[in-house]
């Protein structure tokens, strides 16, 4: 572009467009300068150097810009204007001949104008982190003095003699223990540089940020402002303490601790351009800095000023020096002005104040905290000594400050004195105050005197600023806090010489009709004195109350941001905590302040929430890494090329603008304007149409829908613009071009309204004579097919690479449709009855030319891209003829999008009430290979309110679009009130603070600090051999990323960490070393709690320079005699080897890529559990027997710069070997055990390219380089060795069996406000009263169905309330009746199609014992068992709630429905959820001894388990008399053999045939037990199964299962109660887990558990044992298939061996628990399972770590529309494979296969283990995955996986193209409505019964 052309474009463009044009020029020139393709994506606000444009590249950039602009730019231009934004501003000024900005003050300043304090920040002793924290400390009278820090390596000893050399008289003062911690990444400071930065500088950076935010100013908004910096510092010894310069730190050490750089660093980091001064006047530094800042402001040198000071002591020399001078108090406390004052206390702290001229603060609306009325600074001069204070000088500085303020002494109420607590200094200061402020005061109004130093000690350079903050807070609270430690006033002062009194108690500080005033003094040890006078700020005007919400609360945006994902999560957590603390301000004010005063950083999120509770819940989820609904989250990239796109028809829906019209004035006014412009051409009201008012025409008329859509689209664009989002281009599809032209300024509103109204009216002539069809195929293929119909069918629109619309004659279209279907091309009709964009339009051409004549197009203010031509268009050509062509010609939308992409537009915002163009844009962008393309939809169908719009704005914002959030608060404004800017929590300034290491001030005494995360220190050995001992500690607290490395559920420190430590030790000893050999001897196990201490011993060199090494560990809390565990031995050799050069092409030619989808779930199945920190493997290729890979260090692994190679990244490179080992290798869990020839060439890599070459089944070599091909690491040989879970569990001490009990744990509701009860149905005799709108009561479901038949609305929730069992009722009879009722009700609910989307909640009272001492109702407990099983068959559709208060049942259900748990109890209003927890077990025989002469009655004792238990009673417990009651009797040979075996053991065994549930039989058996051998115990093992899906269950089938288990238990309890003997009942885990298909069995066992619990509650002995699975197959488990066994194993419950089961039987009796659940646990499976594979009850048993790891093999596919969108975005040739993978994954999960590839795609379901239950489970899973309601006949209709996947494809993508734009046609129904599901006349029971017989055998 030539110079005059640039100038012309700039002269006519708006300011934002000018800036954008010049940024594009700079980005293109930068790309040329760096020899890179395309414009360089430079961030306008970041320095060129930080973005790679430095050195020669900066010079080339200047040359390119000079050539492009014709400007003679100086060689220093990139340094003078160091960011792209600044340089663009400079170029704009030069090109438009604008004068340079002012360099000095703006106008005359008032020489004595007061200075406002508008912001404050501090960090002080006592863990004070804010001004509020300081106020709490002084108001509470807290003493913040504590002991010396232990981590600074201070070896100085305490000695009471002040003359004892080298010692200190005290080891107490006020410290900032975490002073070294720093969020370096937040300030874009590298780890290497951060190590060198003095902690004082770090604290100033963080505290300045907080002070600016405290002023309600976005810190980033001050970049380039004339803000001054005035900070006080007095120490600079930190840099000298860094004896070893860490890697990456050379060149920073000097400036890192120079005091002068502290102010410069602040200015540089924040972009301040006012004066920057560092002040060192010792203890008065910060007050002098404040005085200088005020002067600079008054002179106009700056507009804002940062003033303050900081002190952190790197060495203890100050204590030694002042001990010699007798200036320190022995106890470290300043006793200011007290008779027993004994010296000062050297403390630490930082205080920062933000100052502004008072007039400016008021003009800018900044809150004024206090006013600086006057200040003065002077010097002692030639006083009594260099360091001695001088009273007259102090009097002079006070009088100068008073004169400067224009005040008398009596007008100042209080002074926070220097008050250091010295015997000399305090009396001198007190006399000076008496001689000044003590004179001329009214009676009864003394000067009140105190000192902050009495609380926190002397914070030295920060003391004055801290005192100011204290007094400002005291003014604001109206209280003068007391000074501590004053026993009585010092006698060295004549207190009668003036009216001054000490603040020995806190005092109210009334204003008395005038502002409160106070002064602060600071005196430097060198004689520089400072005094500042503060005045209370004028009260802020009272604001009107927030307007009351008129109905539903309006949503608000809550934006947060951070540097990095961890920083963002930390910010979300802080904000959630702040809101949870309950600030009283309105939510709108809080959100407004957050949106307008906080910096917007790169990692962003926005929570859209209607109330505070919702905001807290979503922020909490965000902090935990979850992204729920109405939460946008992304990492921003620059997005200044943004296009507004406007669709044709198809996006409309009734009510699409109503909510926005009521909320946003901008939108409402735009609609009104459109309505006025349309009125002359229509006979209907736009507003009434949009609101759907009675009498208004509907949207099915083309002459209504097109003008209405036009108005909505234009108004949406106006609304987006009000949010500060301006388009750099516009494009419209068909009639959408009319709206685009209006928004671009190319048509007046009147002309645009005329075009859309008259053209749509003309279209009605064509109705009934045409049609349109969407086709999913490339344009060329479609055109070839259409050739046979000539002009009868035309291509109407090309929407994407494989998405077209054709139009024409109805008959020809029908033939074309059939032809496409015959070719296998998906095509479908669009419901319109005319053919726009076809020859039919010619019939209305003349009409249009006539009616649209007079249109006056004009030049656009925004570039207009025509979809008629597919190119940018001069909009003066948008005449009448253009709008006819727009209707007649093919819509070239695909071409237009490609041109927009080519021109650099990466963001597309769709201005429509429902997204129509977005899918096509995404498809085109993907095919075009465009990166970072963002598409945002404004609204969605039936989501047309502020929540949806704000979510759309949030999506744009988080991805990098600049947004002004002010319009978001329009619904929260009233004429009298706008949202206020509030002061938010000061803790939310920075993200994650970590400790840059190793500042040697924090190393252990006597050791050299090692800058390594694993090896903290080293000490040379004194044996003369040249050896070194390295030490370090490991724990999850210090190395949290190790929690993500678990093998078989045991935390194992990866071998790569040991190698890394060995390499670093070698480098420390020899400068550069190769690890010649390392053999791992034992795994290094990391405990969940506590610390492991490691030692790495490196011997001296031998004759060849080699050194032996040994690595050992033991727990840190181990006793002195506890041995160390040796983990590795090896050899270090000198030198690092020579890396192989010439890496060659990448990936290597011929390499075949391996799909890594789900790879970490696959590894988890082998026992290798890698959490996020270790999930670094990104791509993998196979080349013959070699593997090539790319790996990247995840953010969660922490810093990389201090490692040679981060162990997590090193380990990730080895994951390839586990995933794709050499051919023939067995699939075992292998870990590295030997290394040889390991050399490191480059330190700190975060990305690797590596090649693994297998040299055997268990050995390999590795070479790794960085992405530029530079060598990083090589491994000569790595040996792998299989490891077993048992071995690791032995090492870690974890168990494989467990005794569990059911606990009820309190859980906070996810939505504390509870759900809306509107429309709920309350069914049954136990239902609480319900009145509309909170639901309606129904006698039963039949009554509800009758209302539905009459047209009533379908309820969202049905509550089925089961009545409580009446007192005195037989519990089994009650249970049977309740179960029959519940079964019938659930079956009715499931069979009613109209209730398919309704949730069923079964409500009981007292069914579960949820609190200690409670006794459950066995009848209702049985109902819980049945419903638990039903939940497994109808996942996420049925809930269980138990309450203790019928009157609060509705509240209980409301709380539980949103609790996120399928089962819940509500007790005293608290929500409780069930979890299984471990019970302490005892070894050996447990419980009371079995009486040798007593009789044991056993039911079910002849089954497999029964015989096992009976034999155990005889052989282990010595039982000698047994009666076995069996329904089958003892006639079989097998039973006779068993009895004979027992007889041989000396037992007397009687087998009785009979039914234990028959009371007559049972009474007869009991009566037959002889008195000399009375009944001693009852063991109830009997049971029966009758499995089947719930729909096929009947009351009779239930009864068959209930009788032998539940009814028999009731009779046994009833008839043995008087005997008071133990009842040992065998129940099943199914009673609480509720497996699908076992409703009756689950109910029976739940009844038994509750019955025994009630029995125990009445004082009778007994225990119910709810067994998991036994390995020995019994009558209850013998029918289990292999599939059943796999599925059970997937839950983490493994079969018990006989020995384990019998041991648990004994232990269960000894626990004292009434109900226990003995089972075997496969901890690996338990922790590996996906959430839907592990029942919620068992999730509490999973190991704590790795909490974030990948789960077991499931089908981790996106659900619903996400899957459909993913399918649409997948190339046509890959879609079948994608869906088949989803289907096979879910089938594998249902059948319990670890690998989905085990599912053959064409094998019939009947051959792979499907029965009716598994058919139902697969239907449920696929229904959830697709978001569609699938028929129960799914498996029958589609008999193998391949057929099923084909069916799902047609369901998800009936037309795989994006939702077609019917350019001027009628609206198309939603895609979901297009799906025609198969209808079947059979009942569900008949279908399932058929599947059982056909597929289940």
From Swiss-Prot:
Segments forming domain PKS/mFAS DH: 1012-1289
GO biological process: antibiotic biosynthetic process; fatty acid biosynthetic process; secondary metabolite biosynthetic process
CDD domains associated with the record: KR_3_FAS_SDR_x, PKS
Ranges for domain Ketosynthase family 3 (KS3): 112-536
Location of the region described as Disordered in the Swiss-Prot/TrEMBL record: 538-563, 1113-1152, 1854-1873
Ketoreductase (KR) domain mapped to chain residues: 1494-1671
Full protein name: Spectinabilin polyketide synthase system protein NorA
Species of provenance: Streptomyces orinoci
């Amino acid at each position: 572009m030539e110079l005059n052309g640039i100038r012309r474009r700039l002269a006519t463009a708006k300011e934002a467009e000018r800036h954008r044009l010049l940024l594009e020029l700079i980005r293109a020139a930068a790309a040329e300068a760096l020899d890179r393709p395309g414009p360089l994506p430079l961030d306008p606000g970041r320095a060129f150097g930080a973005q790679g444009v430095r050195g020669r590249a900066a010079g080339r950039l200047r040359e390119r810009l000079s050539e492009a602009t014709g400007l003679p730019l100086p060689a220093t231009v990139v340094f003078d204007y160091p960011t792209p934004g600044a340089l663009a501003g400079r170029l704009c000024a030069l090109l438009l001949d604008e004068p340079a900005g002012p360099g000095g003050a703006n106008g005359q300043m008032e020489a004595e104008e007061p200075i406002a304090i508008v912001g404050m920040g501090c960090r002080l002793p006592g863990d004070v982190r804010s001004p509020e924290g300081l106020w709490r400390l002084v108001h509470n009278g807290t003493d913040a003095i504590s002991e010396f820090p232990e981590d600074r390596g201070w070896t100085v000893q305490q000695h009471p003699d002040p003359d004892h050399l080298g010692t200190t008289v005290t080891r107490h003062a006020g410290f900032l223990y975490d002073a070294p911690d720093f969020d370096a990444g937040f300030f874009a400071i590298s780890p290497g540089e951060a190590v060198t930065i003095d902690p004082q500088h770090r604290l100033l950076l963080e505290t300045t940020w907080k002070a600016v935010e405290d002023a309600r100013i976005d810190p980033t908004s001050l970049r380039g402002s004339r803000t001054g910096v005035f900070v006080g510092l007095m120490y600079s010894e930190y840099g000298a303490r860094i004896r070893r310069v860490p890697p990456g730190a050379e060149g920073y050490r000097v400036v890192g601790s120079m005091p002068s750089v502290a102010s410069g660093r602040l200015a540089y980091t924040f972009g301040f351009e006012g004066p920057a001064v560092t002040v060192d006047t010792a203890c008065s530094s910060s007050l002098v800095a404040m005085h200088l800042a005020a002067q600079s402001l008054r002179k106009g040198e700056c507009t804002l000023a940062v003033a303050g000071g900081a002190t952190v002591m790197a060495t203890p020399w100050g204590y030694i020096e002042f001990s010699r001078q007798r200036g320190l108090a022995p106890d470290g406390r300043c006793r200011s002005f007290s008779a027993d004052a004994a010296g000062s206390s050297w403390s630490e702290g930082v205080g920062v104040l933000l100052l502004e001229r008072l007039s400016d603060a008021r003009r800018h609306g900044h809150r004024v905290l206090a006013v600086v009325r006057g200040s003065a600074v002077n010097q002692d001069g030639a006083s009594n000594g260099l360091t001695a204070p001088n009273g007259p000088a102090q009097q002079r500085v006070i009088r100068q400050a008073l004169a400067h303020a224009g005040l008398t002494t009596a007008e100042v109420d209080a002074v926070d004195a220097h008050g250091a607590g010295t015997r000399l200094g305090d009396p001198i200061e007190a006399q000076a105050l008496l001689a000044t402020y003590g004179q001329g005061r009214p009676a009864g109004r003394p000067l009140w005197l105190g000192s902050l130093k009495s609380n926190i000690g002397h914070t030295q350079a920060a003391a004055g600023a801290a005192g100011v903050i204290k007094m400002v807070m005291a003014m604001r609270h109206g209280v003068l806090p007391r000074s501590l430690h004053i026993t009585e006033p010092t006698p060295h002062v004549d207190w009668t010489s003036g009216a001054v009194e000490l603040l020995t108690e806190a005092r109210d500080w009334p204003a008395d009709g005038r502002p409160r005033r106070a002064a602060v003094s600071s005196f430097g040890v060198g004689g520089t004195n400072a005094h500042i006078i503060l005045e209370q700020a004028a009260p802020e005007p009272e604001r009107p109350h927030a307007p009351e919400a008129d109905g539903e609360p309006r949503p608000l945006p809550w934006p947060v941001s951070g540097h990095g994902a961890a920083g963002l999560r930390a910010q979300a957590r802080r904000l959630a905590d702040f809101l949870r603390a309950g600030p009283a301000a309105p939510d709108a004010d809080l959100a407004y302040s957050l949106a307008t005063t906080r910096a917007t950083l790169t990692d962003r999120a926005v929570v859209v929430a209607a109330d505070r509770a919702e905001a807290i819940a979503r922020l909490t989820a965000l902090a935990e890494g979850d992204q729920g609904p109405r939460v946008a989250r992304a990492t921003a990239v620059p997005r200044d090329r943004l296009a507004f796109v406007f669709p044709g028809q198809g996006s409309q829906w009734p009510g699409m603008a109503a909510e926005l019209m009521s909320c946003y004035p901008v939108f409402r006014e735009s609609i009104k304007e459109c309505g006025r412009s349309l009125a002359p051409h229509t006979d209907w009201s736009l507003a009434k149409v949009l609101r759907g008012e009675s009498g208004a025409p509907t949207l099915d008329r083309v002459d209504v829908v097109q003008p209405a859509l036009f108005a909505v689209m234009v108004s949406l664009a106006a609304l987006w613009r009000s949010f500060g989002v301006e388009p750099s281009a516009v494009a419209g599809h068909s009639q959408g071009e009319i709206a685009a032209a209006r928004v671009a300024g190319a048509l007046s509103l009147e002309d645009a309204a005329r075009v859309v109204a008259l053209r749509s009216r003309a279209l009605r002539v064509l109705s009934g004579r045409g049609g349109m069809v969407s086709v999913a195929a490339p344009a060329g293929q479609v055109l070839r097919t259409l050739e046979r119909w000539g002009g009868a069918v035309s291509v109407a629109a090309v929407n994407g690479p494989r998405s077209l619309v054709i139009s024409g004659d109805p008959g020809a279209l029908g033939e074309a449709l059939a032809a496409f279907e015959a070719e296998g091309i998906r095509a479908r009709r669009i419901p319109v009855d005319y053919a726009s964009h076809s020859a039919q339009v010619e019939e209305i051409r003349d009409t249009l030319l006539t009616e649209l004549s007079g249109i006056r197009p004009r030049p656009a203010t925004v570039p207009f891209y025509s979809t008629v031509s597919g190119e940018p268009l001069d909009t003066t050509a948008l005449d009448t003829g253009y709008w006819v062509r727009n209707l007649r010609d093919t819509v070239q939308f695909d071409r237009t999008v490609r041109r927009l992409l080519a021109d650099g537009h990466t963001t597309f915002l769709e201005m429509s009430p429902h997204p129509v163009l977005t899918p096509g844009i995404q498809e085109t962008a993907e095919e075009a290979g465009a990166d970072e393309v963002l598409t945002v939809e404004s609204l969605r169908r039936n989501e047309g309110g502020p929540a949806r719009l704000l979510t759309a704005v949030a999506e744009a914002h988080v991805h990098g679009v600049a947004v002004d959030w002010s319009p978001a608060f329009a619904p929260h404004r009233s004429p009298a009130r706008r949202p206020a800017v509030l002061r938010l929590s000061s803790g939310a300034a920075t993200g994650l603070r970590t400790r840059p290491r190793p500042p040697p001030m924090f190393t252990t005494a006597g050791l050299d600090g090692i800058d390594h995360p694993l090896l903290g220190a080293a000490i040379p050995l004194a044996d003369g051999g040249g050896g070194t001992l390295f030490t370090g500690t490991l724990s999850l607290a210090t190395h949290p990323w190790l929690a993500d490395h678990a093998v078989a559920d045991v935390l194992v420190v990866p071998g790569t960490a040991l190698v890394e430590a060995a390499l670093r030790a070698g480098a420390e000893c020899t400068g550069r070393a190769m690890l010649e050999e390392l053999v791992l001897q034992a795994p290094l196990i990391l405990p969940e709690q506590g610390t492991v201490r490691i030692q790495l011993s490196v011997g001296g060199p031998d004759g060849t320079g080699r050194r032996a090494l040994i690595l050992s560990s033991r727990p840190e809390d181990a006793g002195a005699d506890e041995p160390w565990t040796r983990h590795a031995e090896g050899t270090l050799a000198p030198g690092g080897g020579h890396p192989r050069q010439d890496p060659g092409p990448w990936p290597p030619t011929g390499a075949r890529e391996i799909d890594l989808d789900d790879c970490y779930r696959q590894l988890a199945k082998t026992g290798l559990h890698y959490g996020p920190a270790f999930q670094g493997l990104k791509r993998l290729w196979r080349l013959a027997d070699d593997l090539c890979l790319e790996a990247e260090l995840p953010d969660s692994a922490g810093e990389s710069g201090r490692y040679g190679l981060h162990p997590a990244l090193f380990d990730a490179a080895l994951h390839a070997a586990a995933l794709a080992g050499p051919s023939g290798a067995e699939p075992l869990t292998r870990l590295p055990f030997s290394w040889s020839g390991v050399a490191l060439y480059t330190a700190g890599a975060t990305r690797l390219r590596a090649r693994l070459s297998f040299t055997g089944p268990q050995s390999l070599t590795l070479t790794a380089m960085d992405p530029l091909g530079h060598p990083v690491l090589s491994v000569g040989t790595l040996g792998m060795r299989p490891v077993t879970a048992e071995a690791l569990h032995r090492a870690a001490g974890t168990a494989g069996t467990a005794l569990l009990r059911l606990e009820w744990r309190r859980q906070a509701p996810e939505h504390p406000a509870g759900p809306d009860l509107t429309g709920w149905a309350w069914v049954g005799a136990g239902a609480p009263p319900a009145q509309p709108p909170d639901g309606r009561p129904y006698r039963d479901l039949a009554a509800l169905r009758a209302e539905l038949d009459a047209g009533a609305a379908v309820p969202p929730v049905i509550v089925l309330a089961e009545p409580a069992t009446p007192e005195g009722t037989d519990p089994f009879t009650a249970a049977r009746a309740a179960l029959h009722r519940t079964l019938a009700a659930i079956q009715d609910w499931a069979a009613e199609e109209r209730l398919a989307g309704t949730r069923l909640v079964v409500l009981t009272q007292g069914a579960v014992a949820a609190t200690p001492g409670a006794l459950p109702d066995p009848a209702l407990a049985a109902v819980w068992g049945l419903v638990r099983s039903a939940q497994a068959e109808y996942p996420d559709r049925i809930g269980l709630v138990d309450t203790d208060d019928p009157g609060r049942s509705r509240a209980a259900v409301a709380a539980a429905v949103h609790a996120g748990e399928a089962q819940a109890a509500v007790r005293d209003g608290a929500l409780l959820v069930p979890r299984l927890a471990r019970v302490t077990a005892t070894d050996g025989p447990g419980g009371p001894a079995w009486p040798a002469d007593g009789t044991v009655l056993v039911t079910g004792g002849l089954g497999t388990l029964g015989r096992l238990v009976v034999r155990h009673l005889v052989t282990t417990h010595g039982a000698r008399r047994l009666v076995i009651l069996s329904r089958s009797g003892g006639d079989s040979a097998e039973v006779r053999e068993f009895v004979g075996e027992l007889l041989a053991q000396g037992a007397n065994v009687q087998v009785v045939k009979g039914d234990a549930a028959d009371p007559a039989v049972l009474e007869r058996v009991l009566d037959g037990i002889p008195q000399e051998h009375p009944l001693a115990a009852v063991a109830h093992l009997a049971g029966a199964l009758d499995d089947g899906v719930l729909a096929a269950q009947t009351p009779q089938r239930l009864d068959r299962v209930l009788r032998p288990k539940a009814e028999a238990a009731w009779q046994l309890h009833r008839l043995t109660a008087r005997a008071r003997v133990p009842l040992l009942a065998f129940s099943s885990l199914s009673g609480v887990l509720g497996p699908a298909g076992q409703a009756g069995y689950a109910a029976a066992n739940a009844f038994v558990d509750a019955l025994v619990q009630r029995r125990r509650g009445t004082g009778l002995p007994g225990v119910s044992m709810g067994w998991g699975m036994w390995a020995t197959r019994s009558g209850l488990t013998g029918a289990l298939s292999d599939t059943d066994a796999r599925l059970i194993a997937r839950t983490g419950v493994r079969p018990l061996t006989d020995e384990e089961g019998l041991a648990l039987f004994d232990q269960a009796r000894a626990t004292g628990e009434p109900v226990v659940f003995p089972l075997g646990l496969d901890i690996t499976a338990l922790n590996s399972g996906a959430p839907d594979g592990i029942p919620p009850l068992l999730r509490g048993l999973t190991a704590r770590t790795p909490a974030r790891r990948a789960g077991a093999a499931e089908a981790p596919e996106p659900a619903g529309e996400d899957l459909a969108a993913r399918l649409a975005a997948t190339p046509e040739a890959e879609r079948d494979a994608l869906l088949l993978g989803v289907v096979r994954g879910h089938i594998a999960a249902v059948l319990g296969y670890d690998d989905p590839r085990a599912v053959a795609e064409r094998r019939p379901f009947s051959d792979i283990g499907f029965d009716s239950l598994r058919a139902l489970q697969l239907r449920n899973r696929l229904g959830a995955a697709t978001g569609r309601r699938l028929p129960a006949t799914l498996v029958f209709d589609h008999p193998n996986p391949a057929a099923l996947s084909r069916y799902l494809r047609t369901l998800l993508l009936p037309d795989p193209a994006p939702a077609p734009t019917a350019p001027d046609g009628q609206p198309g129904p939603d895609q979901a409505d297009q799906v025609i599901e198969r209808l079947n006349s059979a009942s569900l029971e008949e279908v399932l019964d058929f599947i059982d017989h056909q597929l289940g055998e």
